[in-house]
Amino acid sequence: MCRLHGAWRQFAGRASRWRQGVVSLTRLEVVVDPPRHCALQPRRKVGDTAYNTPVDELDKIVEQLHSGAAQWAATSLQDRARLARQCAQNAVKVAEAITADAIAYKGCYDYVGDGEEMSAWSFTPSVLNDTARTLEALHSGKARFPSGVHKQGAHTLVRVFPTSALDHLLFSGYEGDLWLTPGSGPTPTAGGEVVVGGPGEVCVVLGAGNQAVVPVADVALKVLVHGCATVLAMNPVNEWAGPHLERTFEPLIKAGALRIVYGGIATGKALTAHPKVGCVHITGSDKTYDAIVWQGQPKRADAPPPYTKPVSAELGCVTPYVMVPGPWSDAEIDAKAAEVVATVAHNASCNCLAAKVLILGRNWDRKDAFLKALRQQFNSAQQRRCYYPGSANKYDAFVAAFPDAEALGQPATSQGADSFRPLPYLVLPPQAVSSTDKGCVDEAWSPVLAIRELDTPAGDTSAFLNAAKEAVNTSCWGTLSCSVFIHPATEAQNKAAFQQYLTDVRYGAIGVNTPSLFCFFVPSLSWGGYPGHTQDDIQSGVGQVHNTFCIDKVEKSVLRGPWSPPVTPFWSIRHGNMRQMSRAILAYFANPSLWSLTRLVVAAVQG
């Protein structure tokens, strides 16, 4: 692995010097539209009801989708794949425009520029193209099969990342596995999630408000994989992205498989209550789920809710990051502290995968050094403007509850989002982990990080892992994703204990030596709450998205990253080439090739 990284460093170094640091290979270029607003509708502003889809029009839309639902369900996998690839091409064309609109609303910060939004949007062609690959393989009669399958205890593990030869070069040192539910058998069913034929039904997707890419994956699953005619209701918070999604999904809209509508609570109520809607998918909060499923009635474990249609949901989480005590060097401490800060800063911390609880060993001899580095990293980062409605109120509640918390960060100097208030990074003082602690059970949805300690004997890694497992499983609210960082020497000395930790931790996605943020951006991994939540205690939700191999019976995903990445990760606030890097990522996912890989490697080493 080290020799491979070294070879790429040498190659990229030569390439970066070529033409004074500018790579000019026409086959690397991606043709994009200039930053402009989609002609389908004028640009929308949050809270502007002028463009809300009228309720009577919603009824017509559902009727139209329902009338063609059976025909769409019978659409061949080959045709679905073709449409998916067309949508992926459209996503590249609108990339500059949707990025420009995103930073106009959310803000553009000196150290990342527009690269954060562009790199997030690159997930769109990634998930669409990868879904197309699976559908094409199934159409040919050969299920697209992952890189390898092996057993770990009662679990079958399926290696789904990296898969292609190019991905192996680019992501050397990373390993992503789907963990199937115990008892599911030694052979996974590739394509088991794909539905073709049947009577067809209409699905309502209530889109996320924080990231424009989230409904893309929802649509890919419901329309392309499950074969549902779908109406996507844009969240009022990011309805500005709707016209760009309309253009991206124009092939599916023309095929009669998708419509995009606008509005707020009234729109959601009308759609979910429509008699010809067969199922619902939500990305949002548990409160939204409860409002739909329980309809204002008290939640009960011994009785079904009044809403009887199937509802899948990807909801929130108080995301824990566990730092396993070990012989971390100063440079390693600094790098891992930066990883934590990056996930808190990303998207103004309005992410269900943002680090919210940092779990350390109270007696770790490097604890104070880590906390010092963490403060330094926060203080070097610009504060973000709190664009999401209600986020500032949540933040203020934490300020009131923890008067000794530290407020850190550089003043915001963003372009755009001037009307929104910048929020300092709020670091809650260290204390013991507790299931009654606000820092562990209340999702802040703002730049808040709780420091929580486990009082285990110094040097007893097994005791720490057991305590950490208990803490994340029983004291932290939600089960969507988590991360754990462990020094290679520590893992080697405690291999069995760490494997048991990964087996027993009840989260839908687990990052090992990498933020769970990256788990989200690998479309072949699953994304969703850990199985087992009930309608009366939904927490992080039910059902999963992504999983572009369409393998059924998935319990969770585990993504391992290298302890010391050879280049600065693209999500890092310390990346010095974010603008070029994000566009190279987009180009690679739009058209994986040696040329686009070269461009990406050059951009990466310049970061």
Where are these regions (language model features)?
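NAD(P)-dependent aldehyde/semialdehyde dehydrogenase
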Residues: 326-327, 346, 352, 360-481, ...
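N-terminal Rossmann-like NAD(P)+-binding subdomain of aldehyde/semialdehyde dehydrogenases
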Residues: 28, 33, 37-188, 221-222, ...
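Conserved NAD(P)+-binding/catalytic subdomain of aldehyde/semialdehyde dehydrogenases
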Residues: 202, 236, 251-362, 533-534, ...
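Short loop-to-beta-strand entry elements in the cores of soluble alpha/beta enzymes
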Residues: 76, 84, 226-237, 307-326, ...
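C-terminal core of ALDH-fold dehydrogenases
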Residues: 82, 463-571
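PLP-dependent aminotransferase-like
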Residues: 202, 214-266
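N-terminal chloroplast transit peptides
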Residues: 2-7
